[in-house]
Amino acid sequence: MRKSFLSSTFVLALAMSGAAFAEDAPPVAEDAGATSPFEFAASGEKAARNAKPEEAGAKVIGGEVAADGAWPWQVALVVAGQPVSADTQFCGGSLVLDTWVLTAAHCIHMADDQGEWFDVDPKAISILVGTNKLDGTGDVVPVEKIIKHPSYSGTQFDYDIALIKLARAPTVPYKTIEVPDANFSQVLNQPGVTTIVTGWGLQNGGKLSPELRQAQIQMLDRNLCNTAMMEARADEAAKGFSYAAEVFALTEADAYALWDELVAKAPMPMSENMICSGTFEGGKTSCNGDSGGPLVVPLEDGTYIQAGIVSWGLTATSGHGCEETATFSAYTNIANFVPWLNEVIETNP
């Protein structure tokens, strides 16, 4: 079995054809064999698709149900020892090698009732492989080891990446998914590039999905996403700030100067370790239960590469489900972590 899943350096140009995702059949699972199918990465003629504005529509909330056998690298993290169902599935993941699953660190590093952070016991979870339905089909594989990024903290979402080592290879048909190197990532992360997110997360109305759902969105400029979030925060913060300015009798010029200073010091919600994907039209993003799952980019030759991991999105103001007016979600930028991923796999044979 190969120990490294780093793709070759790609010499790429964005394709401007805007081929429609809806016309392409999702990949169909077949016997994976003993080796991860990463050989396609050697081609220097790969190109990421550019999304047409009218294509950048659905999200997993309200997205369409994926066909049986589609997205054969998608796995579900489920509670061990319990019947598989939408209630026992809590996160997603992707097979990057025969016995290695890529997921989000926040899926396996949680807080207890007292607010103390802990790593989930590998024996407490299993990995469901080879099915798009949470109905008892597929192969439930035990977990041998869980390794989160050492810089991840439960109090924020930076470095939100983890690897899960399976106790054995799955016994059902599956495929693994390629991840990009840094050079390819620069191309994939261009605004307008088509992305596809899959998962069993919450749908409209807060209902859990028992079937894997797929949705097409697109890459958005991270700085624009940060600006949008900062403006939303500023609208709320400005209400209290204007009152404080009155109390302290600040002149208009002093108040504006102080406000600009505060805004300049505010940390950007999305770091360079994150990808922004969605649509500024709103209401099209991933949700709870999709966490840890893959954000993939379709390439012009019909193959796919995983650019991101579902990390976080905007919560509905009601506290239930996800924000229906949210325009985007944050995804872990996998390319930034390939050296760490390879190191973990090589040192944990």
Q: For the regions a protein language model found, what residue spans apply to each?
A:
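Generic short beta-strand segments
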Residues: L77-A80, G199-G201, S311-W312
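Protease-domain processing segments flanking chymotrypsin-fold serine proteases, especially trypsin-like
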Residues: R2-T9, A13-L14, G18-L102, H109-V120, ...
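Extracytoplasmic
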Residues: A70-P72, V96-D98, P122-A124, V141, ...
